């Protein structure tokens, strides 16, 4: 684009989209030099409640993802990716108006073209929408889906509570069977067991909406009689969403909560026997659980089974409230798809928070070193001179499908430094290429242990190296 046009375009950028500089702190911020960039330039910080996941964290994040994917493969879930932006109404209708997530925590944007949209605070509603939009009711039922991605909640940041965080989730749509509920609890349990740390499963049943309504009325009656003894928040909950009274952590409310009526007594025989079946399956699977009569999982879309996963090891921050340290949660949502405008489709799912899981994994790894596999390099590529650098990069690229793990640092010009790196990576062979080798179409293979070098044809190098490496596969190391 011609520069003049570009300049004109720049002029058109509405003021509100121009770079935001906090006014009060502008001077201070502009003077900051974080050792990067020029003096006088403002250094940007990651937004409050959000965090970068740096390469050094990879050793914790990678096993999470691999584990999630292996479980999905084994239990036959298909991967689904939904957009991070959705219509606001999708979450208002599914999660419910009176929930904290919808009332206070959504990042909402207004736009003439797309209307009121928000960053997704969770993915189950999106999966239900995609199930309908994608005509998945026509697939053989049930449809098993899994996702991995960032969620956004504009909450007050604190330990383990972020504004952008990752979740992995598993959903089963199109089957009403206690074995489905048990499978999802099993997946959550396995996810952590395979990572090497034990978790506690808390489980309850909240039955069907009509049973819950009767229970809510009873609970509200009970709390109304004790109104003068409960905390300010609970007084509000009593008016707005009595079920949330059971989430209260205030000391003054605990004795009242302990004596409160329990939802299980308001369940029909059919709901009770459904729940019993889920528990029987868990017994059969050897998944330990604790019945938690006050567990209701604040969202409107749940029916029957609800459960949460907690670390069984002390969490990163022992002072942290228990509700904040849940690693994951899930349950049955038989009415959601219909509520979203689809056909009646029984369903259930679980979502596990990865950021919190990583925190616990780190904490656990401090005491019990994890046997996380270290990458094993087969060869190291070293180069000397500009032309050799280009050829080395080309050869490294050509070897992508060779199955060999190749170490290199083409941006170091000293051969000595590069060979030291090769030593650090403990490779048995280094491939060295200089100007002379480029011209002659050859390459040097150096045995790192003996220091013996041989010159071979570049085209034959892959096969020769593979043959040499084979003796290590045969256990001759
Ligand atoms: P929920 O469905 O809200 O219970 O979320 C399921 C899991 O996602 C939780 O148990 C957490 O591990 C994780 N999670 C939820 N909200 C946050 C947050 N604000 N920051 C970090 N992780 C979260």
Residues covered by each model-derived region:
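TRNA-recognition modules of translation machinery and tRNA-sensing kinases, especially anticodon-binding
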Residues: 2-477
């Amino acid at each position: 684009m011609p520069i003049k046009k570009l300049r004109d375009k720049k002029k058109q950028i509405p003021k509100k989209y121009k770079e935001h500089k906090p006014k009060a702190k502008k001077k201070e911020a502009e003077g900051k030099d974080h050792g990067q960039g020029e003096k006088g330039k403002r250094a940007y910080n990651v937004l409050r409640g959000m965090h970068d996941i740096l390469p050094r964290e990879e050793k914790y994040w990678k096993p999470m993802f691999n584990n999630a994917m292996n479980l999905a493969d084994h239990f036959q879930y298909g991967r689904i990716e939904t957009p991070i932006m959705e219509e606001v109404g999708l979450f208002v209708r599914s999660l419910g108006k009176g929930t904290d997530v919808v009332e206070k925590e959504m990042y909402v944007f207004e736009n003439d073209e797309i209307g009121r949209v928000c960053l997704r605070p969770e993915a189950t509603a999106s999966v239900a929408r995609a199930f309908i939009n994608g005509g998945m009711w026509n697939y053989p039922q049930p449809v098993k889906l899994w996702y991995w991605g960032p969620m956004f909640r504009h909450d007050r940041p604190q330990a383990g509570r972020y504004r952008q965080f990752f979740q992995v989730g598993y959903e089963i749509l199109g089957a009403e069977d206690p074995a489905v509920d048990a499978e999802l609890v099993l997946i959550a349990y396995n996810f952590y067991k395979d990572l090497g740390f034990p978790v506690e499963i808390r489980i309850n049943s909240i039955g069907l909406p009509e049973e819950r309504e009767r229970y809510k009325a009873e609970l509200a009656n009970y709390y109304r009689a004790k109104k003068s003894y409960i905390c300010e928040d609970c007084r509000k909950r009593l008016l707005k969403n009595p079920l949330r009274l059971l989430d209260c952590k205030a000391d003054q409310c605990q004795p009242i909560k302990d004596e409160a009526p329990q939802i299980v007594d308001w369940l029909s025989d059919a709901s009770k026997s459904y729940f019993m079946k889920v528990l029987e399956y868990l017994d059969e699977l050897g998944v330990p659980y604790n019945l938690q009569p006050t567990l209701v999982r604040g969202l409107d879309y749940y029916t029957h089974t609800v459960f949460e996963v907690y670390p069984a090891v002390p969490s990163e921050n022992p002072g942290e409230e228990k509700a904040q340290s849940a690693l994951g949660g899930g349950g049955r949502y038989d009415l959601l798809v219909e509520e979203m405008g689809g056909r009646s489709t029984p369903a259930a799912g679980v979502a596990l928070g990865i950021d919190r899981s990583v925190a616990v994994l780190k904490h656990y790894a401090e005491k019990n070193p994890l046997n996380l596999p270290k990458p094993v390099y087969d060869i190291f590529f070293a180069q000397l001179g500009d032309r050799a650098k280009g050829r080395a990069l080309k050869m490294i690229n050509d070897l992508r499908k060779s199955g060999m793990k190749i170490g290199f640092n083409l941006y170091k010009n000293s051969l000595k430094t590069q060979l030291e790196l090769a030593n650090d990576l403990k490779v048995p062979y280094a491939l060295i290429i200089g100007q002379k080798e480029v011209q002659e179409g050859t390459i040097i293979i150096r045995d790192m242990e003996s220091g013996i070098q041989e010159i071979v044809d570049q085209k034959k190098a892959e096969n020769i190296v593979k043959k040499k490496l084979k003796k290590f596969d045969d256990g001759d190391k």
